[in-house]
From Swiss-Prot:
Free-text comment on the cofactor: Binds 2 divalent metal cations per subunit.
Pfam families: Peptidase_M42 (PF05343)
Organism: Escherichia coli (strain K12)
Enzyme nomenclature, EC number: 3.4.11.-
Family per record: Belongs to the peptidase M42 family.
Positions annotated to bind a divalent metal cation 2: D180, E213, H329
Positions bound to a divalent metal cation 1: H67, D180, D235
PANTHER family attached to this UniProt entry: AMINOPEPTIDASE (PTHR32481), AMINOPEPTIDASE SGCX-RELATED (PTHR32481:SF12)
Protein name as annotated: Putative aminopeptidase SgcX
InterPro entries given in the database record: Peptidase_M42 (IPR008007), Peptidase_M42_aminopept (IPR051464), Peptidase_M42_dom2 (IPR023367)
Active-site residues from the entry: E212
GO biological process: proteolysis
Keyword vocabulary terms for this entry: Aminopeptidase, Hydrolase, Metal-binding, Metalloprotease, Protease
Cofactor: a divalent metal cation
Length: 373
């Protein structure tokens, strides 16, 4: 049966997986990888790794990765009344929290709830126009009191996810929670399906990582075992085709996958990625040869695992492919199935290249003469 991008994505979106609670998605990734990979394992932190391609010990090692976790919440306190206080896990958009429907993964199974908001009829002044902070909010699961909530399987530490089943919009767009980064996980499975029947010159490691939304470093144990020569991440990036962002950058939905030139943490440049120009050339040349649309991006405020991967070992050259996404970290993210398909095509083409085409070493300084100090 041929690989279906939409069916795979929608299947992954059915699962809930805040940081540190990725088991449901990990089980799917393990099952799919085991169909065709030469080697599959899950480390103690929860990362899922699948190896494809060359068995030669000196083969070039390309690592392609995406994270399984999504933004969400965690129960902090059960009030005597049965209402639940909670904390954010990762960075769910605070302006969309009040009034959202959520799913709690309780000890006895999923429990539906909603994030309460002061009744509009009694709201005054700023209460009608401003979003409350998380400490002013609560989750209502319909419990009569604290004991009732506990009987339902809820306790301190219960994970909470946003609820919004995937919907297909016009022009091959999809709307759902957790497109960040089930889009990337879908791309991994698409690449796995494509390369499983190819004769590869290199070894390809596909990695579904954990805790990206929480500490961005959950993938580190994989690096120390795989020791990749290059790494390419798959994640989302804000699409700037909406009325509020149309002047910010040229990244657009349905215009191809983004190639990151620069990203960094929104509160300073303490972590981020400046993609080596040689890797940008490799990605753009490969895309050109296979007629795959791509677009460059500079994305302050965006950070992925590449910011930490690049400084492991002797330095790991990193690139990041970004799937444009509207309304990021909200319950209703929107992205394009076409862009996702283009991402899979580009990564498959890269995996099929010979080792000689991968610029592992830095560019030489051939444009000016070097003099000793």
């Amino acid at each position: 049966m041929s690989f279906s991008v939409q069916e795979t994505l929608f299947s992954l979106l059915q699962h809930n997986a805040i940081s540190g609670h990725e088991n449901a998605v990990a089980d799917v990734m393990l099952c799919e990888f085991r169909r065709q990979a030469k080697e599959v394992w899950r480390d103690r932190l929860g990362n899922v790794v699948a190896r494809y391609g060359s068995d030669k010990p000196d083969a070039l090692r390309l690592m392609i990765f995406a994270h399984m976790d999504e933004v969400g919440f965690m129960v902090r306190k059960i009030e005597p009344s049965g209402f639940l206080r909670f904390e954010r896990v990762g960075g769910p958009a605070q302006v969309t929290m009040a009034g959202s429907i959520v799913t709690l993964t309780g000890d006895k199974g999923p429990v539906m709830g909603c994030i309460g908001i002061k009744s509009y009829h009694f709201a005054k002044g700023d209460e009608r126009t401003q979003s409350p902070s998380v400490d002013k909010l609560w989750i209502d699961i319909g419990a009569k009191d604290k004991d009732d909530a506990i009987r339902m399987g809820i306790q301190v530490g219960t994970p909470v996810t946003l609820y919004n089943p995937p919907q297909l919009l016009a022009n091959d767009l999809v709307c759902s929670k957790a497109l960040d980064d089930r889009l990337g996980c879908t791309a991994l499975l698409g690449v796995a399906d494509a390369i499983s029947t190819m004769e590869l010159d290199i070894a390809v490691y596909l990695v579904a990582s954990v805790q990206e939304e929480f500490n961005i470093r959950g993938i580190v144990p994989v690096l120390r075992r795989v020791k990749p020569d290059l790494a390419i991440g798959i994640d989302i990036t804000p699409s700037c085709d909406t009325p509020d962002l149309h002047d910010y950058s040229e990244v657009r939905i349905n215009q191809g996958v983004g190639i990151t030139c620069l990203n960094y943490h929104g509160r300073g440049t303490l972590a981020g990625l400046i993609t080596p120009p040689r890797l940008i050339r490799m990605l753009e040349q490969t895309a050109l040869e296979h007629n795959i649309p791509v677009q460059r991006e500079v994305a302050p405020g965006v950070i992925t695992e590449t910011g930490y991967i690049q400084v492991e070992q002797d330095g790991i050259p990193c690139a990041s492919l970004s799937i444009p996404c509207r309304y990021t970290h909200s319950p209703a993210e929107v992205a394009s199935l076409r862009d996702l398909t283009d991402c899979i095509r580009l990564l498959t083409a890269l995996a099929g290249m010979s080792a000689a085409h991968f610029p592992v070493e830095p560019d030489s300084g051939t444009t000016q003469e070097a003099h000793p100090l």
